[in-house]
UniProtKB/Swiss-Prot annotation:
Main location group: plastid
An example Gene Ontology CC term for this record: chloroplast
Name of this protein: Superoxide dismutase [Cu-Zn], chloroplastic
Keyword terms of this UniProt record: Antioxidant, Chloroplast, Copper, Disulfide bond, Metal-binding, Oxidoreductase, Plastid, Transit peptide, Zinc
Substrates-to-products reaction catalysed: 2 superoxide + 2 H(+) = H2O2 + O2
The keyword Cell cycle belongs to this UniProt entry's keyword annotation: no
Pfam families attached to this UniProt entry: Sod_Cu
InterPro entries given in the database record: SOD-like_Cu/Zn_dom_sf (IPR036423), SOD_Cu/Zn_/chaperone (IPR024134), SOD_Cu/Zn_BS (IPR018152), SOD_Cu_Zn_dom (IPR001424)
Amino acid sequence: MASQTLVSPSPLSSHSLLRTSFSGVSVKLAPQFSTLATSNFKPLTVVAAAKKAVSVLKGTSAVEGVVTLTQDDEGPTTVNVRITGLTPGLHGFHLHEYGDTTNGCISTGPHFNPNKLTHGAPEDEIRHAGDLGNIVANAEGVAEATIVDNQIPLTGPNSVVGRALVVHELQDDLGKGGHELSLSTGNAGGRLACGVVGLTPV
């Protein structure tokens, strides 16, 4: 294929032209054209999309609360918890399989467990994805906590959106209590309040 020459407005000697090629086409570029082409290049920046969800917990007792979940790109999910009306002490806190509260919190089903493992602590390798451990209520019955977990994403096949968060009556034994329910529920007792996880604007 014949060479193509870009000519600048001012006369240039033949030795001042630069030669390059692309797609089989030979192109002679004047130095100022080459500088212009490279100096205007800006790298592509990909901005990660943050996601946010909320769950409003209600029950048949005075226990209630609000939980927010946020996730940046594909990173872990940060869960901010504030629940009131609890008895002082530890209470199991889990993500359950279903966002169904038609018959109260019992309709939310078992813990969210896509990997079909036994119950454990949040830091355990073998655990339910929905095992979020315990929250601690103070003398006024208020529990505030921040949980960071990488098994409860807000998007993808294991998204927690549409599932339910549940706070329990008793302390979760984290699968280590030796009770017949330890490896399924942590023997955390009844379900005091629950709420469906739904997306909200960031």
